[in-house]
Amino acid sequence: FLIKMKSLARKSQRLLNSLKIKGNDYTEQTYNFDLDSIIPYYIKDFENANSIVEAKNQFFKYQKEVYELSIPFYIESYNYFKNLDNNFAVSILKTASEKAKDNPKALKTIAYKFEESGDYEKAKIIYKRLLKIRPGDEQTYRDLALIYKENEEYELAASLYNKILKNKISNVNVLGLQETIVNEASHMYWTKADKLILTDFPLKTLKTFVPKNDWKNFGYDFRIVFDWNDPAVEFNIQFVDPKKKYYNWSHTIIDDKEVLEDELNYGYNTEEFIIEKSDKGEWIVNIENYSIE
């Protein structure tokens, strides 16, 4: 289970209103636990190696003898080596992507890691692979449009937004992610309009999704986007505002059964929250995973 967060709304008003409710005061709890107990033993062996060469040799040994098909092994190893030898770390992700070429959940995790490292070109390759194996998923088209933008391939991004917003993708109606995509396409227009002049960016269509006054004043104080790699995963996200009032959003069968079923049926795993007119100060975001993996 992995969540990708990006700070840049659908539930914004509900979030802010619930923060005003009496009784939802946040009390920070601290727990004592042994960090060493959750560190994989092979990472400890890497750390105890006498040199990076020895650590790499241990990686290859574990890969060959135990973890050849283990995606968590590759991800944890990447996290360890990325600050020591980035090229070697990237090669680990490339190997993982080859092992997981037909595993959407694993490929999303690998793509998130490439994005985290700023290697948008390799992330694009992964997202194009996801498009090939999951052509009916809404998420695939949204992710690909975003990565085109990050790679400054504005013509490709514009063309894909045109297909999405004009409902031109065969057997795919992007409804679950519609508001998120509208926000992201709008943001691209307002920040990269000069790059879109000669493209087929769907400006007129996009405007039909946004109230006139909102379009003229497009923007928001703070936007948080959550992407997760497993549509069936259950978790809770808690927002704590500067006044220590909290709001919980639960992604569980008990609390939001219809939404989870919709996500599974139409293939999307993104949620966004827009926060405006908030008190200044530090926000806290806590995430609790209810799924066992």
What is each model feature region?
Residues 80-81, 114, 148, 189:
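Residue at a conserved register position within TPR or TPR-like alpha-solenoid repeats
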Residues 83-84, 117, 151, 192:
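Structural motif corresponding to the intra-repeat A-B loop/turn of tetratricopeptide repeats
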Residues 192, 199-293:
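Intrinsic-disorder/low-complexity signal
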Residues 76-80, 109-110, 144, 185:
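Structural register within alpha-helical repeat arrays
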Residues 33-36, 66-74, 85, 100-107, ...:
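Generic helix N-cap/helix-start motif at coil->alpha-helix transitions
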